Regions:
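Alpha-helical cap/lid subdomain in secreted, periplasmic
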Residues: 1-151
Length: 151
């Protein structure tokens, strides 16, 4: 959000108050989420829209010029992964759409060697393997069952 001063009718009296304004800045992650959800809400007003958070990020190396650090490092923008997760949750509240928090609910935590059962291992602790996808799918299945499919 940004804030601006605006004149509004409050109980029959025109008063100046601070107003929150949703960001639609395409140069920001939050702005792009808001642009997308604004368009989806307009184009599909009767459909259930669901947001998902990413899962935890383990390390990955796919060559000298494609090395992905773990989530405990900031990205090139200076943000940690949890800042993006909070932005997704904020958008969920702004746009009245549910969010399935796979970051918390999936149980996949590739930061520990013992979690190798859910990732390819070796140089790729970022992507789920077949067991990881099954666990993620099960999480999504049970969460989606709690949501209305018709309105």
């Amino acid at each position: 959000f940004t804030e601006e001063k605006a004149v509004v009718n409050a109980d029959g009296v025109m008063v100046k108050r601070t107003r929150r304004v949703t960001s639609f800045d395409p140069a920001t992650y939050r702005g792009r989420i808001n642009i997308a959800l604004d368009g989806l809400k307009k184009k599909y007003p009767t459909k259930q829209i669901v947001l998902l958070t990413p899962i935890h990020r383990g390390p990955a190396s796919f060559g000298d010029d494609n090395v992905q650090p773990t989530e405990d490092f900031q990205n090139a923008c200076g943000e940690y992964l949890d800042a993006y997760i909070e932005s997704i949750k904020e958008a969920s509240s702004i746009w009245s759409v549910p969010v399935i928090d796979t970051y918390s609910l999936s149980g996949i935590f590739p930061m520990h060697k013992e979690q190798e059962i859910y990732v390819p291992g070796g140089t790729d602790w970022l992507h789920p393997n077949e067991k990881g996808h099954h666990r993620l799918a099960s999480c999504l299945y049970w969460q989606l069952l709690t949501l209305p499919c018709t309105f």
